[in-house]
Amino acid sequence: MNTDFVYTFPPLIPGILKRRYKRFLADIELESGEMITAHCANTGPMIGVCDAESQVYVSKSNNPKRKLAYSWELIEVDNTWVGINTALPNRVIKQILEQEKLPHLKGKYNKVRSEVPYGKDKKSRIDFVLTNESQQNPIYLEVKNTTLAKDKIALFPDTVTTRGQKHLQELMDLLPDAQPIMLYFINRGDCQQFSPGDDYDPGYGKLFREAVKKGVEILPCRFEITPQGIRYLGLADLKF
């Protein structure tokens, strides 16, 4: 067992992507020749990570209540595996936080809470709140899955996201009573840098720069994705 994985996949099944459609669905030809329809958890445009005839991996659930037994997990892009399952980043980050495996935050907290209400009228939920009895200001941490890349630079977002803009504004509104952090989960191992996706959502890019100036901390976390598991590679350089 490889102990440097922060997440280990169950046995995955190789195949070839035939098409992705209706946002949630992907037709895949398995190595055995069987054609299946898998669930696609990523409902965004998936720019550059849903090309037909690409190598992919799927997982299979034994839950009889599931409409689709297979879930699309990975795709190969330019000899790099990219994570497709958008449910994974938060699970991985939660595990890393609970095991204190994120060096940047090590020793700054001793309690992790998930999906905590915050913001105006407590109608929003932050992914994680980290607290420490000896620390006055709690850490509020939001996670964003990042798969788009251009010239080895990871970019977020890949489309206009009013929800993402709202999250940036709400993190700014926490200052100065909390330490807000936006963590970008770079779901591919080939990017050394991170930038806001200005070409895809200029409004987000503007808010991103405002957030940095006001004191929102940005953690662009690099991960290597393999069919066996996920490794943490450290922080990407910010470029903006």
From Swiss-Prot:
HAMAP family according to UniProt: SfsA
Family per record: Belongs to the SfsA family.
One Pfam family, short name: SfsA
Superkingdom: Bacteria
InterPro entries: SfsA, SfsA_C, SfsA_N
Single Gene Ontology MF annotation: DNA binding
Protein name: Sugar fermentation stimulation protein homolog
